[in-house]
Amino acid sequence: MEQREDHTKSSEPAFIPSKRTHQMRNIWAWGGPSSTTVNGSSDAVLFSSSLPSVLQFGKLPGKEREYNAQPKDDMFPMMKQPGTNARVADPMDDVAQHLIGNLLPDDEELLAGVIEDFDHVKLRTQVEESEEYDVFRNSGGMELDIDPLESITFGTAKASLVNGTGSSTNQYSIQNGAGTVTGEHPYGEHPSRTLFVRNINSNVEDSELRSLFEPFGDIRSMYTATKHRGFVMISYYDIRHARNAKTALQSKPLRRRKLDIHYSIPKENPSDKDMNQGTLVIFNLEPAVSNEELLQIFGAFGEVREIRETPHKRHHRFIEFYDVRAAESALRSLNKSDIAGKRVKLEPSRPGGARRSFIQHFNHEFEQDETKHNSFQIGSPSANSPPSLWSQLGSPTDENKLNALNETAFNGGMSPLGSNHLSGFSSGYPPMKSPVGKSSYWNNRADNIFHGSPTLHNSHSFPEHHGGIISASPLVSSAASSASTASGFTALTGTSFLWGNNNNLRDHGQPSSIQSQALSNSLFPNNQPQRQSNLYQNLRGSFGASEHFSQFNVGSAPSVFPFESNFGYFSDSPDTSYMRQGKFGGTGPTRVSGSLMTNFGAYPRINVASMQNGSVGFEGLLDRGRNQTVGNSGCQEDSRVQYQLDLEKIIAGKDTRTTLMIKNIPNKYTSNMLLEVIDETHEGTYDFFYLPIDFKNKCNVGYAFINMASPGYIVSFFKAFAGRKWEKFNSEKVVSLAYARIQGKAALVNHFQNSSLMNEDKRCRPMLFDPKHTENNNQILLNGIFISMAQQDATQERHDLPENPREDNFS
């Protein structure tokens, strides 16, 4: 017995006390302290709380308590005893394991108690809530892994459920504090010049990527160091090129992988020199300076995408260009220049800065209307998203009666007025106040337009929901687009200001004079309050005005994509008004100021005369909008028709336009090179020439403008150059000719005389010529600017426009 007692002491385990000490002590008390018991207790410990109370546990002897109280270095000291090669079997081990196995509850008994403790009603509710929360995943979306580099891909966004169901567009859930980002949610991805391309094969070559993305436009940079991680960054100069590339290449297979492309949002604190967004901020601007005047000044550097203001700060303006190179050129030329007697300061806008401030400002308002704004998304509008919400047509600082009208007259339903979507076109930016002469008349008279107008006597139904399709009255669209210019001008926000009016399809049907007069009198009575601008006059009577095909607008012919043109210029009388069709078939009155045309064609087109003929289903309007997409060849063709040269009409004298746009010019050509080519056959037939220059890259932008002295010269000019291949630089480009939007020498001079191009190198300025070969150079003074009438003789001597003698203009 003494030997066994000694052996027992040597085999007792020593361990550090822990919270499991009590459980282990109970097992040892039953089976006796042994190493086997300790090893076999792991299974029993899991169910120690389930052991019945019939087990009579004793107290450990005093020496065992000493072992428990004093920590040792080893759990099994017996294993270290010299000469011990095997464990000593304890006859009590088998007895302990057998009894414990019989006393433990079986599976049914164990799970029965667990199931009885559940509240089935609460469990079902939790499951339903979980399913609703997971609606994004159920709708076919995906979750993106958290990656610090990927956080720059998404802007701050807020998730929303559309009427309790998931949107059909892709949803992206991120966990960086920005919430859930919807692919085309108003708070989702904002159009950017940088594309974040995922799912890239690591073996793809850089040249292969460049050849894939470069056809859509000039690539600014390519970041391919992360190909091994499955993504790259492609940056364009022009945001339209990025948009077109994203639309065309989305899900395109590349080495058996479908590309996943998103817009990339710049970092929160970019460098002051980061011009990725192409937006400039003007400080200390005279509030009286209109957006039209700013457009004339900044439009000389490139196409302007948007001009917007900040609330309560009329002396600040944001000028956003499509092309960042134009923004850089404008910054260099106009910074610290004098505009309207004040020295202004230009700075690059912090990417998304103004946008974020408006998001915060309208956060609460958009939360309330979010379901309504998103319940009518159709298709994938990524290529057509304008940078402004369509639902906010007024100023953020003014009382917006338009939204109230949408909620009251239409009972909170979707309408062509309050809708922020037309056939799947979603929005990226919040509404930016952009008053091109903001009229207050709409705020006072909006309700009267749709309530009891004597001339609009036929019954027109308000929108009704039918299985997700909305019917609407044509009266609403036409009257709304007409009323938007009640006092002759209004704020151009949303698509009207950003995309302008496309002029590509005209409304030839004109109402009778009686109908026109009655309609204008009912909408715009004589006692209406007016706030006239010095650039505008009353619009009353403009509905009956005829279109003048002799004057076509904007400084360049339209691009292939119909959404790229913004503003129009022309040199006709300021009293001329137009009813034109917008890019989506929208009709809106157009007011003209000097050489500037602004338009309001944001709504589906309805002939003014046809407003008396009853309602038209909204499905037709949707079809019209869907038909005018980027990929629609018919729309592309229509956008070119009005600028195409028709030699038969020119010969017959029906088309008297004289200003041409020469396209597809190799970038290395200079003005002198181009003029030498022209003078080979047409010396002395033109009086204006201008080759726009990219000042950053020191090359031309690929097109030029020339004004022929007579329309008759266009026929021979077309025959000599159209389709001709350029001889120098081994270029594969061929000459393409089209009419320019600014027509006539006088309009061109008026457009460029106050341009900042006067501060650029003389070789980059527009040039005037005297086609009559006068012996001496003539100079004319226009608004304090001398313009040289260059001699055109056998020596080919030409003079650029001289520097501006008034140093206080743009110095």
Curated annotation (Swiss-Prot):
Q: Which residue windows are transmembrane per the record?
A: none
Q: What is the lineage of its organism?
A: Eukaryota, Viridiplantae, Streptophyta, Embryophyta, Tracheophyta
Q: Where is the RRM domain?
A: 193-266, 278-351
- Record protein name field: Protein MEI2-like 5
Biased composition of type Polar residues is found at: 374-397
List, in alphabetical order, the GO biological process terms annotated in this UniProt record. positive regulation of meiotic nuclear division
Instruction: Give the keywords, sorted.
Output: Repeat, RNA-binding
Q: Which organism is it from?
A: Oryza sativa subsp. japonica (Rice)
GO-annotated molecular function: RNA binding
Describe its function: Probable RNA-binding protein that may play a role in growth regulation.
Q: Which PROSITE patterns does UniProt cross-reference here?
A: RRM (PS50102)
